[in-house]
Amino acid sequence: MRRELFPTLPHDVVILGNFNQLYKIEPTTFRSWLRILAQLPKSILWLLRFPELGELNLRRTAKAWAGAEVANRIIFTDVAPKSQHISRARVCDLFLDTPECNAHTTAADVLWSSTPLLTLPRYPYKMCSRMAASILRGALPKTTEGRQMATELIAGSEVEYEQRAVQLAGGLSYSMTDSGYGEGYGRLAEMRKLLWDGKWDCGLFDTRRWVDDVETAYEEAWRRWVAGESGDICL
């Protein structure tokens, strides 16, 4: 699928990506991404035309802030149908989250594809800035490996966010197999395997548990209404 999406891309290029609507990319985040690209000459940033008008503005801004070489390594594709969107998310090597307003459903889609997601809860008091960290923790196994991976992918500051991105992406390498496909090596490849192995048992994708919890909450809400009781219902 990588060849279908990016037929001219060399096999050793690392694909950084974000599939959010473009309004979530505010200036501070975009500057961070440009600095990350500048430190990773064998990388691209994959964004969506979401909306199409945003592409021209971001390209113009990238050229003004970081120069033509970096700006030319930002690649836009059209928004895909849902099934294709989830499938092709695995082509991305590292998803760079938007700290101001995180990926929500998109984060779950990306993690289902087993693509590592780097996030920064920029504002502890804003739920939309903490969401991806919570989703990520829900996708990871409750093991030492899972907890370690969470500490690596949940940054504590802008500087740490950029450093982690450069470290993880810079440590990824590919070698071509006899069948003509690239095989990844490095910490990002290890993270992808952990996400793949863990998603069948993790809480985030345990649909049966979600349904059971919601049904229990509905029953409890009805019971409280009949009894004239109030209060939060915790799932």
Question: Residue spans of the language-model regions?
Answer:
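Catalytic binding pocket for nucleotide-activated donors in carbohydrate/polymer assembly enzymes
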Residues: 90, 94, 98-204
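Conserved catalytic-core segment of nucleotide-activated headgroup transferases in glycan assembly
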Residues: 1-81
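C-terminal amphipathic helix plus adjacent low-complexity
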Residues: 12, 20-22, 48-50, 57-60, ...
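Residue-level signal for the nucleotide or nucleotide-sugar donor/cofactor binding architecture
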Residues: 28, 156, 209
